[in-house]
């Protein structure tokens, strides 16, 4: 599902479900589009597509880091990214990208800070993903995160599995200030990674990228499990 107003992205989402659950999933996504805090859309697109092969992989381990404010949170995020070999100036460029917001997908930065996504407005959209019911239940019941964590862990686990070095993300929900950094070491939820009413965004860090990897990010189907 993708929802927008006057061409500006408002919300998106997707599910990977069995045939008998399609109607339930469509209604859930429609409700999300119509009630999103970023505003009422004038355009909603819901696409239903048959998937022949689904990959099942384990979720990245989830760790929450509580920070007092945005400055502290950014330092924590930067430290995690620096440990993955990402230069400080590239991290700072990524912060500027997510703070600008407005992209439907992810920006892609190499270690020289060059933007590599083919379409800078669209970005690269990671699709055909979902979490298993038992993973969702574990996250919510054990207080590991929120519904947004359930959605985000699917993206993070898939992209790291496919060879992305790291991901930096803040939510496009204006009131949700917890963001995350994902690496092969885990999914790090970081509170106050942005301020209330600020936009959000997503950046993937790579050594290099080609059409084949972009295709896999966008098209290969993954269900994330325990």
Curated annotation (Swiss-Prot):
Highest taxon in the source lineage: Archaea
CC cofactor: Mg(2+)
InterPro entries xref list: BioW
Catalytic activity: heptanedioate + ATP + CoA = 6-carboxyhexanoyl-CoA + AMP + diphosphate
Magnesium is among the record's keywords: yes
Keyword tags: ATP-binding, Biotin biosynthesis, Ligase, Magnesium, Nucleotide-binding
Pfam families: BioW (PF03744)
MF terms (GO), sorted A to Z: 6-carboxyhexanoate-CoA ligase activity; ATP binding; magnesium ion binding
GO biological process: biotin biosynthetic process
EC number(s) from the headed UniProt entry: 6.2.1.14
Pathway in which this enzyme or protein is active: Metabolic intermediate metabolism; pimeloyl-CoA biosynthesis; pimeloyl-CoA from pimelate: step 1/1
Record bears the keyword RNA-binding: no
NCBIfam families in alphabetical order: bioW, PRK01322.1
Recorded family membership: Belongs to the BioW family.
Oligomeric form and interacting partners: Homodimer.
Function: Catalyzes the transformation of pimelate into pimeloyl-CoA with concomitant hydrolysis of ATP to AMP.
HAMAP family tied to this protein: BioW (MF_00668)
The protein's name: 6-carboxyhexanoate--CoA ligase
Species annotation: Methanocaldococcus infernus (strain DSM 11812 / JCM 15783 / ME)
Organism classification: Archaea, Methanobacteriati, Methanobacteriota, Methanomada group, Methanococci
Gene assigned in the entry: bioW
């Amino acid at each position: 599902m993708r929802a927008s107003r006057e061409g500006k992205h408002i919300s998106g989402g997707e599910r990977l479900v069995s045939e008998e659950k399609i109607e339930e999933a469509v209604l859930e996504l429609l409700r999300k589009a119509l009630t999103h805090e970023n505003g009422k859309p004038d355009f909603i697109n819901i696409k239903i597509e048959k998937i022949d092969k689904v990959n099942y992989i384990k979720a990245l381990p989830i760790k929450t880091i509580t920070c007092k404010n945005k400055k502290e949170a950014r330092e924590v995020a930067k430290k995690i990214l620096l440990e993955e070999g990402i230069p400080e100036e590239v991290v700072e460029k990524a912060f500027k990208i997510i703070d600008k917001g407005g992209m439907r997908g992810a920006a892609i930065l190499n270690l020289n800070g060059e933007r590599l996504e083919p379409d800078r407005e669209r970005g690269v959209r990671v699709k055909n993903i979902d979490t298993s019911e038992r993973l969702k239940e574990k996250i919510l019941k054990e207080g590991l995160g929120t519904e947004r964590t359930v959605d985000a862990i699917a993206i993070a686990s898939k992209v790291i599995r496919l060879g992305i070095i790291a991901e930096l993300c803040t939510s496009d929900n204006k009131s949700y200030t917890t963001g995350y950094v994902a690496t092969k070491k885990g999914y790090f939820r970081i509170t106050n990674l942005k301020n209330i009413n600020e936009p959000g965004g997503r950046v993937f860090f790579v050594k290099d990228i080609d059409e084949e990897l972009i295709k896999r990010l966008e098209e290969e189907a993954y269900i994330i499990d325990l």
